[in-house]
């Protein structure tokens, strides 16, 4: 089925929207905004979850399980059906009925594009760091009194939500490239954190993946700006190409990266950063104004994300000092180096449990490097990781890189591959990663046995990370219990 791409709010009636998979991170966010705008929202999800409770509380009618009759509300059908074409099969009974009834079926990105209309659009794109950078931008702009609307792929720890319909002119959102959805938007400010081949099951070649970011840059409004990270080679090259095309482009990055790419005017330069007791202290020059910010979440990649967030806020009129105050107050996003607890007493005294969404070698490297920095600053402990590969295609494509990245830990437990939307591949297991690792590693295909395996490896003051985009997140509290009670 061909999915319509809509050009204006007049093309579709959003008065009564049905969302299939409403409990997902992206879908639940747009549902919140629709409800805040007074729309009637129904939806369905395969299983009940804590995500559905607040949506029901503000007026959504949600069914658990998929059935044709879920489309009806008091005998009336929706004006539009929204779905994720990657996650929802085409024989879903609600999709089938929508087609039979002639109801328009659109993607989440089409809906988000409609919701963005009329706002000053700040879109955060890139292979890695979208959710963190978007979240930092939100918190910074909120502190600057801008009350932006936002839709992000994770839940802000402090706000406890992934979306908000604000009173300000700015709307901040992630621009997902995985299926070229980012080409639905017309940003006023487009941030590209990095560009590295991914989602090759969709794009087929790295060249096609790179091209989608060039196309995205071409959709920026005439008076808008492209913002690129100069520390990332492909993002910097995108910036250089865009400058030559006449697209207004600025860069951010460390001083050496800024010097290496003089063709892209730098508007945010990281002058210095160092680990301190509170986190990471960074000195950043924003368009000639030098500011100091303390980031609670560790890692050089988070300093870069913070610089991007400050620059995005500055470009849409935010006061730099207030933006910095907000950024210093940023406590993270669910599943991004998320703290679950520490052990007090016993043989695991001082061990701390964290959970992270990292599922690409570059992300794994960044998170483990940040953990190592924290251990080094403390002068004690090790880094232990429980990693669950996500998708067979990604595991096969990056098996060598995963082995190298995971070897930054001191020891690891690697779970079986989480296939998600993919079917198992004969002869392929997580052992293609573990066989190439250079640290002590346990391949553990039994999900429920992982906490025990971690207890056999961990020690006092260790940082223990559960990592991956699948079900591994459920193990963080179980590992905490295992170590606390062992």
UniProtKB/Swiss-Prot annotation:
GO biological process: cell division; cell wall organization; peptidoglycan biosynthetic process; regulation of cell shape
Keywords: ATP-binding, Cell cycle, Cell division, Cell shape, Cell wall biogenesis/degradation, Cytoplasm, Ligase, Nucleotide-binding, Peptidoglycan synthesis
GO cellular component, as recorded: cytoplasm
Annotated compartments: Cytoplasm
Residues bound to ATP: 126-132
Gene Ontology MF, one: ATP binding
Pfam families xref list: Mur_ligase, Mur_ligase_C, Mur_ligase_M
Known pathway: Cell wall biogenesis; peptidoglycan biosynthesis
Top-level enzyme category: ligase
HAMAP family per the UniProt record, alphabetical: MurC
Function, as annotated: Cell wall formation.
Protein name: UDP-N-acetylmuramate--L-alanine ligase
Species this protein is from: Corynebacterium glutamicum (strain ATCC 13032 / DSM 20300 / JCM 1318 / BCRC 11384 / CCUG 27702 / LMG 3730 / NBRC 12168 / NCIMB 10025 / NRRL B-2784 / 534)
Gene coding for it: murC
